[in-house]
């Protein structure tokens, strides 16, 4: 195998495919990238046996063939070469990477040992605007847990909802729901968020085909293919947590709320909540940390309902408000012990349900 390509283009396809490679895998082959060249096209594949990423690049193909190269080292080596054309040649158990002087020789891994990746796309595919899906996943993904000991909570639920797609994630402290109109879906599948987080950075955000199969979810664009193993678990019943109406409602500018919570977080630690006193005329935020001090401020807003004080984790509150794509934030509550619902003014496509902290 021998190719020539522009340094930045080659580094890009190696880096994007390398996002699927597990750095801690006990199998050396899973720390490599499969590079295949045929007909002027380079295809690069990385996998950890649960997530696979395949990227493509048109190259000057001097000789077709295949090799497996160390993922991180190869991508870093190409990136460190001088700008311009780069050559990559595989022969006699080594891969030589050269460009305008510098030369790397890397040990080749066995192509025969690399896992077989099925390129077949399931029959039921949906065409989506990749940018829309990537944005929706970035919003709802804040609710997913990072605790691998609870795999059910590490995923994003894809399910049909009124002819469209609904995305749902929860870590048991908060629930994020995003409805995406114009994207059809059938059934429901639970997909690991750690892989979905890489969607835009691996295959891009252009026109996309999405297929949710029995074993894996597949996302394909003209820049690449991301396949993720489905989580075989039952997602928590969440609909009962979303009441049809709330008796208390606050409207407040997003920037003002974010700035105020940010100042409160300077005093608070992760386990110390910010208190929100909701009353006619707005909201009073306060945080008290006995050994350090306190911070208090008032934000003007529109409030209807009974005066009440509710407390939230500062980080969870900040992440939820930041994810809302609106200049005005709506906070709806039932009482100080039940979850509060955050969404944008006139927009409930994204909803963020946050458990309060008991005072």
Language-model segments: residues:
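Structural preference for solvent-exposed beta-strand-turn elements
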Residues: 1-359
């Amino acid at each position: 195998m021998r190719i020539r390509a522009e340094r930045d283009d080659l580094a890009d396809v190696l880096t994007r495919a390398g996002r699927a490679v597990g750095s801690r895998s006990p199998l050396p082959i899973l720390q490599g990238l499969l590079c295949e060249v045929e007909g002027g096209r380079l295809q690069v594949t990385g996998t950890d046996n649960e997530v696979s990423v395949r990227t493509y690049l048109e190259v000057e193909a001097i000789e077709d063939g295949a090799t497996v190269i160390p993922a991180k080292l190869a991508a870093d080596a190409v990136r460190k070469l001088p700008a311009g054309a780069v050559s990559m040649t595989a022969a006699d158990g080594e891969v030589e990477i050269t460009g305008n002087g510098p030369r790397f020789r890397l040990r080749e891994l066995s192509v025969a040992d690399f896992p077989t990746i099925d390129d077949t796309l399931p029959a039921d595919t949906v065409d989506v605007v990749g940018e829309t899906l990537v944005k929706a996943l970035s919003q709802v993904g804040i609710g997913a847990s990072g605790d691998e000991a609870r795999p059910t909570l590490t995923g994003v639920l894809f399910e049909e909802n009124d002819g469209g797609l609904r995305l749902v994630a929860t870590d048991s402290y908060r629930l994020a729901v995003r409805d995406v109109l114009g994207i059809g879906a059938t059934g429901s599948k639970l997909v690991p968020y750690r892989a979905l987080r890489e969607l835009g950075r691996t295959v891009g955000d252009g026109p996309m085909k999405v297929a949710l199969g029995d074993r894996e979810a597949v996302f394909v664009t003209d820049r690449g293919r991301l396949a993720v193993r489905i989580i075989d678990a039952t997602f928590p019943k969440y609909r009962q947590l979303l009441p049809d109406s709330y008796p208390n409602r606050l409207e407040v500018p997003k920037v003002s709320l974010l700035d105020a919570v940010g100042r409160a977080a300077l005093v608070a630690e992760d386990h110390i909540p910010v208190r929100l006193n909701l009353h006619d005329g707005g909201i009073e935020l306060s945080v008290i940390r006995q050994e350090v001090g306190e911070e208090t401020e008032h934000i003007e807003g529109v409030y209807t309902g009974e005066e009440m004080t509710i407390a939230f984790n500062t980080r969870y509150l900040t992440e939820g408000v930041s994810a809302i794509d609106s200049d005005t934030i709506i906070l709806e509550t039932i009482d100080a012990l039940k979850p509060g619902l955050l969404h944008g003014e006139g927009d409930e496509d994204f909803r963020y349900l946050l458990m309060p902290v008991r005072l």
